[in-house]
Amino acid sequence: MIEFDNLTYLHGKPQGTGLLKANPEDFVVVEDLGFEPDGEGEHILVRILKNGCNTRFVADALAKFLKIHAREVSFAGQKDKHAVTEQWLCARVPGKEMPDLSAFQLEGCQVLEYARHKRKLRLGALKGNAFTLVLREVSNRDDVEQRLIDICVKGVPNYFGAQRFGIGGSNLQGAQRWAQTNTPVRDRNKRSFWLSAARSALFNQIVAERLKKADVNQVVDGDALQLAGRGSWFVATTEELAELQRRVNDKELMITAALPGSGEWGTQREALAFEKAAVAAETELQALLVREKVEAARRAMLLYPQQLSWNWWDDVTVEIRFWLPAGSFATSVVRELINTTGDYAHIAE
């Protein structure tokens, strides 16, 4: 299995270094649910600004404040502790009376707004995230500038970030041990983290191998293509390649890579043979996913940061802004810009 740091680059390995997350204010994330609260219902959506707190800690504190069980507080996604983040929490509080959440106090945390909502906020139920990052001590401004220009046109690999695999790769290591021993894992959180890490690592491997080809955006017979921003896909045929290539070049269609698991992977013929060969050595992880009935799926191979802009504060400091759809990793964008340094270079967004 290819280590995350050794995955193939789309724009070549960066020539310079830089410091990511010198302080929490250098990594700002604003969650975009894509909808507004209903204004009624048994749930309460709470928009939180936090600095130095992880999501689960804040959710547990909110549950305690509302005198409800921790499982009654949900969120769409985990946000980094070592960052300034805005995100929504959802608490199930039936009844007509609205609690005064302005009285909720937690160090490093502030309630920005809250309102009633009809439905529980479930994991993954967000449109995306807006990021504002500051890279400091940049050693090669010209290289970073050119890479930003290139990313606007060609995007970046849609890799799962190193944080998906746990500190020091612990989640992936857990999955590998589980696959080798076939010992039942009772802990639901471990099961979820390990299976996710296994599938994500296989996806990354397929993308890394595809990037070694002359043109990663070249449609081949049997590729699974999806409309940009959509989840469903269809299979490319030889007769359609020219027209499909035009639509891929126009970013109307995206070439996808497999999230291996049980069932058909989605590609056929040449594309399927390539994907199978890319992960042929990882038989144990593939068998684990099939055994645990994790369904195969697809994910776009490339990621195009939206609303990408940047501003150099000086020759060694740049502020970068962009928006990413849910499930994408800001650190996979930064990886194509600089070789990051600092304690929090690969902490989760």
Swiss-Prot record:
Active site, per annotation: 80
Catalysis performed (reactions): uridine(13) in tRNA = pseudouridine(13) in tRNA
Record's keyword annotation contains tRNA processing: yes
Keyword annotations from UniProtKB, A to Z: Isomerase, tRNA processing
Enzyme nomenclature, EC number: 5.4.99.27
S-S bridge residues: none
Domain TRUD: 155-303
InterPro entries: PsdUridine_synth_cat_dom_sf, PsdUridine_synth_TruD, PsdUridine_synth_TruD_CS, PsdUridine_synth_TruD_insert, TruD_catalytic, TruD_insert_sf, TruD_pseudoU_synthase
GO terms of biological process kind: tRNA pseudouridine synthesis
Residues reported in the UniProt entry to bind substrate: 27, 129, 329
Transmembrane segments annotated in the record for this chain: none
GO CC list: cytosol
GO function terms (MF aspect): RNA binding; tRNA pseudouridine(13) synthase activity
Function summary: Responsible for synthesis of pseudouridine from uracil-13 in transfer RNAs.
Listed HAMAP family: TruD (MF_01082)
Family under the similarity heading: Belongs to the pseudouridine synthase TruD family.
Protein name in the entry: tRNA pseudouridine synthase D
Native source organism of the sequence: Shigella sonnei (strain Ss046)
Name of the gene this protein is made from: truD
